[in-house]
Amino acid sequence: MSGYTVKPPTGDSNEQTQFIDYFNLFYSKRGQEQISISQQLGNYGATFFSASRQSYWNTSRSDQQISFGLNVPFGDITTSLNYSYSNNIWQNDRDHLLAFTLNVPFSHWMRTDSQSAFRNSNASYSMSNDLKGGMTNLSGVYGTLLPDNNLNYSVQVGNTHGGNTSSGTSGYSTLNYRGAYGNTNVGYSRSGDSSQIYYGMSGGIIAHADGITFGQPLGDTMVLVKAPGADNVKIENQTGIHTDWRGYAILPFATEYRENRVALNANSLADNVELDETVVTVIPTHGAIARATFNAQIGGKVLMTLKYGNKSVPFGAIVTHGENKNGSIVAENGQVYLTGLPQSGKLQVSWGNDKNSNCIVDYKLPEVSPGTLLNQQTAICR
């Protein structure tokens, strides 16, 4: 039994009947054989071969596909040569295709320590021939830009000529940006006399107890990063994601029921911000929004030498300031490293329980240039 699926008319009297599908139950699938072989050739690349045959009832004809190829690297330059053959019972002609591709990274011509914006870009070329006179050539460049590699671009042009194919030129260009507050994309394509422009935006929003946070498109399970005061800090191993102006960020995908490591990049912290810890581990359940909280100390960073009387404050003394009760421990020669200090204030120093084992430091930080990461000063404890 055979027949067609007919598209219903819309009411236009000039519309012709459209046959959108064909079926033939007389030629039902009977059996299939497949073989696939691949082999690494050490530093010389790899080769592969695959073949398949689909047989049908009530006919001796069958669908046949054969392909084999060779991939050969020349350092960081990659090349491939492939051949494919196909024949099916619905077509009288057999299809052949011979294809060659070449990919050259821009870094091939750069030093290993190059900071060029195009160090992650590539040039590509491909040629295919149907062995009937038809040939297609494509060439282009693609890669990533920006320090976080979150701007992907691709430009390609090509032409087709000869054989039974229609001759002409074609091309396209695309830009895809992945940002902390969402993704955007724009593209242009042209083929023959027709052209197309497209663009789009996507993202996600989480409403939580501390407000609203924007991010990239959300998955089923995700992580909300909370680091108040640590704004515009990069999230390690996440493309284009950093904390917003309040110190919040969304990690749109997380592994459920497993430890997820969330790390802030300490190198992207502002000069007056220090984190108690830069790595937090969360274990979300399915569909949950896990929160990774980081405690940021905002203020001056000081390496202070404390004097008590004519001597240094004893080794092991605890120094606290304001509401920070965690304290810092005094090292040798009365030196202590303090973070999150306001421009002026008081420090409480303690190394025992009696009144002679406690003192207070009145300090005032000097005005320093923005590039100064650490103040050093000596203070008297009274």
From Swiss-Prot:
Coiled coil: none annotated. Pfam families: PapC_C, Usher. GO terms for molecular function: fimbrial usher porin activity. GO terms for biological process: pilus assembly. GO terms for cellular component: cell outer membrane. InterPro entries: Fimb_usher, FimD_plug_dom, PapC-like_C, PapC-like_C_sf. Signal peptide: none annotated. Transmembrane segments: none annotated. PANTHER family: FIMBRIAL USHER DOMAIN-CONTAINING PROTEIN YDET-RELATED (PTHR30451:SF21), OUTER MEMBRANE USHER PROTEIN (PTHR30451). This is Fimbrial usher domain-containing protein YdeT. It comes from Escherichia coli O157:H7.
